[in-house]
Amino acid sequence: MATYDEGNIFAKILRGEMPAYKVYEDEKSLAFLDIMPRAPGHALVIPKAKARNILDVAPEDLCHVMQVTQKIARAVMKTFGAEGVTIQQFNESAGGQVVFHLHVHIVPRKAGVALKPPASEREKPEVLAEHAKRLAAALTAT
């Protein structure tokens, strides 16, 4: 298994070297919006621990990420009027992983509405800012 790359974009976000549309943060995790969302409200949850993917993360960090994923999923559904939610997590290149820091996708869904293709179109910053504000407010209220 490959080693953790300190230069990955999520590590840079955690260090404050790259901006992100943050919606939730605690001592062990960070949640923010995907800048190329497959649907409005598409969020990502990452551990603050250095973990390439699910294969090398400490069990307690994985458990915490999943607890936060559930919290974000509930808020995403309520905030964006979703009827369901898709949770995705990829491991290694052959498994579809592109950014090599463990992350979980939370994609709100509505019946009959197709998702945009992955990494297809960058959302406008003002739209992401508004979505982040709404989702962060919903998470604060819970």
Range-by-range predicted roles:
Residues 1-142:
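HIT superfamily nucleotide-processing domains
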